[in-house]
Amino acid sequence: ADIEATVMAYNASHFDGAEPKGFKDFFDTDKFPGARSAWKYASSGILEAALLADGVKPEELYPLDVERALKKLDTIKEDIIWWETGSQSEQLLSSGEVSMALVWVSRGLSSADKGVKIDWTNWTSQTGFWIVPKGAKNKELAMKAINFFTEPVQQAEFTKYMPYGPSNKHAIDKVDGKYKGNLPTDHLDTRTLLNSEWWAENQARVDLRFQEWLLQ
């Protein structure tokens, strides 16, 4: 019912001059020193971010070249502090323990008052769906609930508590002003949509390879 995002966020206190832009800078610890952080989960978008930083065009990402992505990750492996919960990612950034992190946009925005900024040069997103299972006993009520959840007023209100982008375009003008210009729906032109079909077919294999790489 909304458009989620994994974005590059950074603690501005780490940068006196130029500030980082895009995944390429996330992987450039010479130009932008400091620890990095990302979700310890293969299908979080970290492999896509690595490939984009390595020069792969968004439209040419799939099928993912996993080994190339891991080779790119090797360049910053010693600098990465992996997060496993959203609150952990927010703490790492806001405390300044890491200079940059790939985080859920809601966590980045929650830390804005602590000097955390979001860069929209590159970001990734996954597709989510509301579904009613075949044979559901309360199909009509379920459909009414989905209709309610996706109405403009409800979507705009939900953004106050979870600042993702409303999927109903009629909700955009109703969003709280403090988030306008900094939601996924304001930056769809720079989004890379993860290929859910490819991941469904390959996740078990890639998860195993990613865990092997982490232990190396």
Each model region followed by its residue ranges:
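Structured segments of extracytoplasmic/periplasmic soluble domains
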Residues: 29, 76-79, 92, 96, ...
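C-terminal capping/gating helix-and-loop segments adjacent to ligand/active sites or protein-protein/ligand interfaces
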Residues: 156-216
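A ligand-binding cleft/hinge motif common to bilobed small-molecule-binding domains
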Residues: 94-95, 100-116
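A bilobed periplasmic-binding-protein/Venus flytrap-type ligand-binding module shared by bacterial periplasmic
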Residues: 7-14, 51-55, 127-139, 146, ...
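Short, hydrophobic alpha-helical packing/hinge segments within bilobed ligand-binding/sensory domains
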Residues: 89-92, 108, 142, 155
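Extracytoplasmic ligand-binding site segments that recognize negatively charged/polar headgroups
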Residues: 1-94
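Periplasmic-binding protein-like
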Residues: 29-43, 66-75, 112-136, 149-172
